Amino acid sequence: MRKFLLPFIILFTTIVIILRLFFLQVFYHDENTSGIDNIAIETVYDYPERGYIYDRNGELLVSNQPAYDVMVIPSEVKNLDTLELCSLLELSKADFTDKLQKAKDYSRKKPSVIVHQLSNTDYAVLQEKMRKFEGFYIQKRMLRSYLTHNAGNVLGYISEVNEWELKKNPYYLAGELIGRSGVEKQYEEFLRGKKGVQYFQKDKHNAAIERYKNGALDTLPIMGQPLQLTIDIGLQAYGELLMQHKHGGIVAIEPKTGEILALVSAPSFDPSLLVGRDRSKNYTALYNDSIGKPLYDRTLLAQYPPGSPFKVVNALIGLQEGVITPQSVFSCGGGYRYGGHIMRCHCGRGSNDLLYGIALSCNAYFANTYKRAIDMKTSSEVGMEKWTAHVKSFGLGNFLGSDLPTGTPGKVPDINLYNKQYGKGRWNGTSNISNAIGQGEILTTPIQLANVMAAIANKGYYYTPHIVKKIDNKVTPFKEYTEPKHTTIDPKHFDPIIRGMNMAYLAGTARRTQIDGINIAAKTGTAENFIRVNGKRMQLTDPSIFVALAPVEDPKIAIAVFVENGYYGARVAGPIASLMIEKYLKGEVYRCDFERQMLEKSLEHEYLKPYLGQKFYINQ
């Protein structure tokens, strides 16, 4: 019996080892499996090109360019000549040691980046020499190549995945790139494509010797899907040019579709600054600009009092609730008086009907309208509840649900706010009368106010604003961008509002913005402007606000312009909006002197005033 036992044990052990090796090499070849890494298989990724990005007219905005990273797999590093490698990579020994330790901390068996984005010259020099350093290799990747210097806030940028993203999403490995902002982030899963994979058999010295299974399991990379945006890059670039040396935002929307034609945040930034080895340095410079804040997308994030443009929303609510008609007349006499206070007005007329109230932006008219809407119901709470619901139906006070980064919701006051502020039953329409003229507690973002104009252009409905028109040459399949959202206002009430806005353009507060051959409905605006600097509250020059739709007969563009510290609406925002409309509808700007005034207009001195430690004046 004993003479058979030893051979049996040897045979059994051999069979177990063979079966184990067979299992590991054939069935358990996932790249995240340490067993394969230890024994026989090397996984090499072939990175795809990201999808190209085009504007609405088919102009290519973003393509790709090759870049090369020096990678390390710590478990494969052997017999390392640190000084020679540091010399080749132009790294100090301390810097190299730190990078290598971080790679080990991440994973001893997965690749990590040691040097990002070699130049083509450095790559040519290092390509052959890297073979002598076991565990190190050069990985080709695709970086973005921007064919435009505009729309940085729209396009966004890509950067290396961070530790949190590596833990959250197993698709990514250290050193890989991901959309970080803008369209690059929002449409990452469409743009990134699919990595190709190659498996190599390794010998006992850990060197790749042949394709595993003759490449039967290998896959080719699949390029990301192309995107066609809704923006007109010519209009976008023109808007950024007009907003040079100014802070604020321009949003232009096609009312019939909700497609965003331009999304200008100023100051803007060149997206190509965030590509290449200087990306980190350039990002830091942009981030540290505490006054201009070019990385802060004002079109989506900045919450401003809408000022007088909000009067048209109050007028629509008044018409819907039956508290006014287009023929309703209110006296002005220099302002609206309430409880020993006066809300001043500069319309210059003793009394106004609705159309003149809009055209001349009469504060008294809209204060009376607002008070009636709030107080003529069974209680002010009921009136306020209805008012809040009407305002929110225009997309205000909430996220619009666009395909852009989330942004901010703005603010629409409600009964809970005033019950908390004044006490239940202890307030009425005059307690918050500033809401009548777009100040008080109400706040909007530029994209929200442009969307209000789109809803007015459509006489009661809007499409959710969106930035992508086609994915992979097919119309976007998202129903939320093709189904209209209706306001609570009956369509019949929009005609007098549009006529009043047209009067503002022809003979009222917006008359300076007239364009030959284009009939516009417009509304100017401004609001008081307070900020805190080092804990001290101070008042600055008012913002310049302007909204419009054009042409009146068949609106093709709805626009909102905010210019911080620009003073009154017709001073800066109005001219900029009219130039944008002219550019879009005519394809060219013919008012060259008017254009030159806006191009040369700088408000940098206004933005520095609160930080110079000197006495200053406002609204000059």
Language model: regions and residue ranges:
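Cytosolic-side transmembrane-helix boundaries in multi-pass membrane proteins
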Residues: 601-602
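Beta-lactam-recognizing serine transpeptidase/beta-lactamase-like catalytic domain environment
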Residues: 62, 203-208, 213-216, 256-308, ...
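Periplasmic/cell-envelope proteins involved in peptidoglycan metabolism and beta-lactam response
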Residues: 1-280, 303, 383-393, 436, ...
